[in-house]
């Protein structure tokens, strides 16, 4: 840091060098002040602002440092005027808004107001009424793909090996177990859809609808997670575990899908079979009364089109049916690859719920 003496010396040197290297003759008399004031009247149509007069005085006495300070003062005036305009615009547009805060943007992008079928206002921004569905609970939950090839057996036993540490860690806490399961299950659809999207761009070809199907699967699993977050309140170490598991699984599945899509889809198919088993055990605990059958979260009622008096048991039934549909889709995708074809060669089961 510079000492006070050094600071004074620097100011003195700059004061002597200023008149030689920075011409300030125009500002050294009253005519210069008149020029500045006249320029302000010409540019703005109004007499000079106090800060503009201060600029003249500052530049007259401190010719070297004046340019930077003059710019700062001018910017302050502009910011002040802009704040005043924004304040008047907000006061004009406040009208019927009440206490709701709306973002006023130059780009004019305004969210549309959505209503339900009965005319009431739709309160969710994370999904819209046309994205909701009514699950098919009649789907066969017992279907199983018997592993025959080496890759099938590898996928099957990989998923089985992941089940044991999960059983040890969560034991009978099926709410937290479901939360962990959904954070993992939402990854494959996003990874597969992303890679198919990039492949479609590289090869200038259609995807057969599989990009949308896989991304819809990821979104459906994410909504399951949002539902169970309302039921199970995870601890800090469970959140840390989710963070670690998701990071490892995302990268592992990404590499697996690049090397062998049929193996990747088969793994997800077996993972969904395990999810069906977990939710079946969840339902047994609810039936026994070991887990309180609380009212269904509002987000699940609207997303799955459940009755208003639905409970957690109804939510688990719907989620289990969703997992069965994801099981079928991923085993089907793996079978397409096993038959030597690409996913784009077979139409995707869009909207298969």
From Swiss-Prot:
GO CC, one annotated term: mitochondrial inner membrane
Matching Pfam families: AOX
EC number of the protein: 1.10.3.11
Cofactor needs: Fe cation
Region annotated Disordered, chain positions: 77-99
Complex and partners: Homodimer; disulfide-linked.
Annotated InterPro entries: AOX, AOX_sf
Intracellular or extracellular location(s): Mitochondrion inner membrane
Record has Cytoplasm as a keyword: no
Cofactor binding notes: Binds 2 iron ions per subunit.
Regulation of this protein's activity per its record: Stimulated by reduction of the disulfide bond and the presence of pyruvate.
Lineage: Eukaryota, Viridiplantae, Streptophyta, Embryophyta, Tracheophyta
The gene coding this protein: AOX1
GO-annotated biological processes: alternative respiration
Summary of the function given for this chain in its UniProt record: Catalyzes the cyanide-resistant oxidation of ubiquinol and the reduction of molecular oxygen to water, but does not translocate protons and consequently is not linked to oxidative phosphorylation. May increase respiration when the cytochrome respiratory pathway is restricted, or in response to low temperatures.
Organism superkingdom: Eukaryota
Organism: Nicotiana tabacum
Protein name: Ubiquinol oxidase 1, mitochondrial
